[in-house]
């Protein structure tokens, strides 16, 4: 059941877009895709460098949506757009190298997917006139990519994937009425996770929860961290944390063995074994970002004058196969409000 409940909040105008090409190569720590393009009738073509911080479903969906959003505005890969795609494989140093390579190759725009990629792109492009469009950033202000009022700090704008923490807490309380402690696994170096945890800490008591947080540095830390946390909590709630999401299969395997439900932060995680989320659709987030980028590429707006945007309403997504596996009963009336219900668990 696919009812979309996505209402887009425009903090200002709309933003950015640039180009793409494609033949495939890979570097150490990164992957690169390029594709040949052809000119449009008026001869205008664009070249966009896409830097994605890590390889997992949420960010992949964001990239797919970004390209789709550009196409909906007439900037089509293989026609008037060349896309150069590279993946930093969750390495900040590699993200910096990718950004520098985009600047050297003379792209018209850089799209940074996730906070470390966007920050690297912004720093690399700071002394140029190349606009940077970001997406999948939980807190652009804390990341230093936007001012407190949402205005850009430079030639940079985009979209935020801010987790609706209060709605998530309310959902957990409805599904697990007797739960007392929520566990959160997070990467200590990700500012987006720090921001989300502060909000959880501020709101958890309102819904009768205590928090148990465990920090990790790399994906290799997840097994031990999970062994530790599952003995102390009634459930786990994921953040939009790139390292944790990369290790989702391990997280869910450990939690399921302990009979502990995991609540996701977006749709893809629910498809892959999380019980539920009040989260966003990353394809839709990417589409909105692509439309912003198109405005910038066409000269209809300037990234430096556009506030970043968010998706204001997120929907309930539920996996009944996970509920059955864990013996969790979800109230029928509440389940009927879901945007989408999955009855299988996707293979990871």
Can you name each region flagged by the protein language model?
Residues 19-38:
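Bacterial lipoprotein signal-peptidase II cleavage site
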Residues 48, 66, 157-204, 307-323:
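An alpha-beta-alpha
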Residues 84-147, 241-263:
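Beta-alpha junction/loop-to-helix N-cap segments that form part of ligand/metal-binding clefts
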Residues 42, 139-181, 280-301:
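Hydrophobic alpha-helical segments within soluble ligand-binding/sensing domains
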Residues 295-348:
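Hinge/cleft segment of the Venus flytrap/periplasmic-binding protein
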Residues 191-266:
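Pocket-lining segment of extracytoplasmic ligand-binding domains
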Residues 46-73, 84-93, 189-193, 242-246:
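Extracytoplasmic "Venus flytrap"
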Residues 2-24:
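Sec-dependent N-terminal signal peptides of Gram-positive bacterial secreted proteins and lipoproteins
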